[in-house]
């Protein structure tokens, strides 16, 4: 039990905003994170095609983790005062380490591209809406976790958890705050995930920019 105490102390600072929760290490300033790479998903082979009954949410044709990585790059690159390793450089560097376990892949990748930290994303739920943006029989539902890992020490220094199933204003009056950004419409799963990614990355940027 005592071994867990140092980790707990590093994660005292936390933030919650509705469907997005994040935590960061209390010594983030001393880490001097300047250059960040995104860990590409491990290649698990072709995804099986699964039949879906009419009117039910269709599973994505793409790997949900690939979808998340694709959304992360523009969100990260759009913000100043940090360096984001390009996707092409990351994929080239990761070709020779794809068979290693995640911790080894992360460390080797970070060292290969001279990154201070590596961002790891995992999509745990990606369910598309049934219907269109003006009338959905079933809303989009997305859940993902982001972890920023210090390459040198190998520990998690920031994490974010996004979990949302879109609700109408009549179901939840608290969604009124997002109407100005999203409008009164039903989002696709991509749009919902992108909204969560931008918010999470924005929180991370405030922390990194603040200590840079």
Question: Which residues are covered by each model-predicted region?
Answer:
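Second-shell loop/turn segments in exported
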Residues: 54-63, 93-97, 133-134, 182-187
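Extracytoplasmic/secreted cell-surface and envelope-processing proteins
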Residues: 48, 128-133
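Short secondary-structure boundary motifs at beta->alpha junctions and helix caps
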Residues: 137, 150-201
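A structural "domain/chain start" motif
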Residues: 15-92, 197-212
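Hydrophobic core residues within well-ordered beta-strands of beta-rich domains
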Residues: 117, 140-142
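A short, structured loop/turn motif at beta-sheet edges
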Residues: 32-34, 110-118, 148-158
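Sec-dependent bacterial lipoprotein signal peptides
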Residues: 1-15
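Short, solvent-exposed, polar/charged sequence segments at loop or secondary-structure edges
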Residues: 79-129
